[in-house]
């Protein structure tokens, strides 16, 4: 370390050269890797969403935004059973406990322990104040809310706040209370006033989120942009969006996001579709990423009843990339039996040998999506797959535990 660097760190009371971060898996493997990177020196892989970050998910009506966010947040929260919380500001009234249980697989008891929904009386001011109070509560109970991550800094494990999660659905409906008229209709609120309030709030929130490991995921809409000139097309609000697309709530809330994800529904599956799913594919585009290349698009498979089918989405990825070969009868490396499209889910769910072979076959493809150069932050998974499986299986009867080994 140079003399000047050492002196500055001492003078400015900087403890580390750079902060060390963990990441959390969303359960959407292709997204996690396309949003991740690998350190070319240490070969560490950094996938998923970074701790204490802010993500915005946008799309037109009916594109599965809320379901995507709920499945993502629950998947990130599950490893921290009994210690984390999901605070859901459902301004659109789009979610019910039954829908959450159906799409995420959690129980009513799990929701009771980890989930709070607020859908009335939410304004920009008290939304901000709630998050400030949330952060203060974590700071005041710091020792009870720390966990030992698998990050090592100067030979010692790094202690982290247990992650907590906030969902805002949606930014388009977040308005400042002080501008409401007496009747409460909000008729005198302009888009500019709302954008100004959001700008102030989000600028102040970002450091709070990072410091206390509060993970904010915001749902927003994609609207038709108003053409302002007869002679010149509109400038894109953000790269990789279309010129005729507009996202409400102000530009600051967009630019401050660590990740900006756009969902767009495609034509529904036909009854004779090869996957036998009742739903439709959804194009997921990473409009903005601070860990990987922006502009990447890929498909996720969505069903009306159960939300995003993550195993089938991974299977679709593998087929399109040639990892799975064949037409009627299919093969994968490491598994000597052929199978049909319609048999995949049951095999993946119930056949340990098949699941292992399929996941191993997909691994090189997923790793090829990682960016080769990261931000320089030291990042590593907060929890391993084996630890997740131990947590999931710990309450199973001994007979079931043995059968899963």
Question: What residues fall within each predicted segment?
Answer:
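Phosphate-binding/switch region of NTP-binding enzymes
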Residues: 191-321
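Conserved, well-folded catalytic cores of nucleic-acid-processing
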Residues: 34-38, 60, 72-80, 102-107, ...
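C-terminal regions of RecA-like/P-loop NTPase motor modules
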Residues: 1-15, 268-405
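A structural signal for short, well-ordered beta-strand segments and their strand-loop junctions
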Residues: 88, 167-168, 217-219, 262, ...
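Helical mechanochemical/support elements of P-loop NTPase systems and associated helical scaffolds
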Residues: 23, 27, 50-53, 65-68, ...
């Amino acid at each position: 370390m140079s003399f000047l660097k050492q002196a500055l760190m001492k003078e400015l009371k900087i403890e580390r050269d750079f902060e060390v971060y963990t990441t959390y898996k969303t359960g959407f493997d292709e997204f996690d890797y396309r949003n991740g990177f690998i350190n070319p020196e240490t070969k560490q892989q950094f996938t998923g969403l970074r701790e204490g970050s802010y993500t915005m998910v946008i799309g037109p009506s009916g594109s599965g935004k809320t379901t995507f966010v709920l499945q993502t947040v629950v998947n990130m929260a599950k490893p921290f059973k009994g210690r984390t919380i999901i605070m859901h500001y459902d301004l659109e009234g789009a979610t019910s406990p039954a829908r959450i249980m159906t799409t995420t697989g959690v129980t009513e008891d799990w929701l009771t322990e980890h989930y709070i929904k607020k859908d009335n009386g939410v304004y920009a001011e008290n939304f901000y104040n709630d998050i400030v109070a949330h952060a203060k509560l974590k700071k005041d109970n710091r020792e009870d809310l720390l966990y030992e991550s698998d990050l090592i800094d100067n030979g010692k494990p790094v202690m982290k706040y247990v992650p907590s999660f906030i969902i805002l659905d949606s930014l388009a409906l977040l308005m400042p209370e002080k501008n409401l008229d007496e009747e409460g209709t909000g008729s005198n609120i302009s888009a500019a006033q709302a954008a100004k309030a959001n700008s102030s709030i989000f600028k102040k929130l970002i450091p709070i989120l990072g410091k206390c490991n509060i993970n904010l995921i915001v749902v927003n809409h994609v609207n038709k942009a108003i053409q302002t000139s007869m002679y010149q097309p509109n400038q894109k609000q953000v790269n990789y969006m279309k010129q005729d697309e507009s996202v409400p709530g102000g530009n600051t809330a967009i630019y401050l996001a660590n990740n900006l994800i756009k969902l767009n529904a495609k034509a529904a599956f036909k009854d004779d579709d090869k996957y036998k799913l009742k739903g439709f594919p959804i194009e997921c585009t990473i409009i903005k990423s601070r860990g990987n290349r922006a502009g990447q698009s890929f498909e996720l498979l969505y069903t009306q009843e159960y939300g995003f089918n993550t195993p089938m989405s991974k299977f679709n990825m593998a087929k399109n990339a040639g990892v799975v070969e064949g037409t009627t009868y299919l093969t994968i490396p490491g598994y000597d039996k052929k199978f049909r499209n319609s048999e995949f889910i049951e095999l993946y769910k119930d056949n340990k040998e098949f699941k292992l072979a399929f996941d191993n076959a997909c691994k090189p493809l997923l790793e090829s999506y990682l960016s080769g150069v990261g931000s320089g932050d030291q990042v590593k998974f907060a929890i391993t797959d084996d630890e997740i499986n131990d947590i999931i299986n710990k309450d199973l009867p001994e007979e079931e535990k043995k059968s899963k080994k």
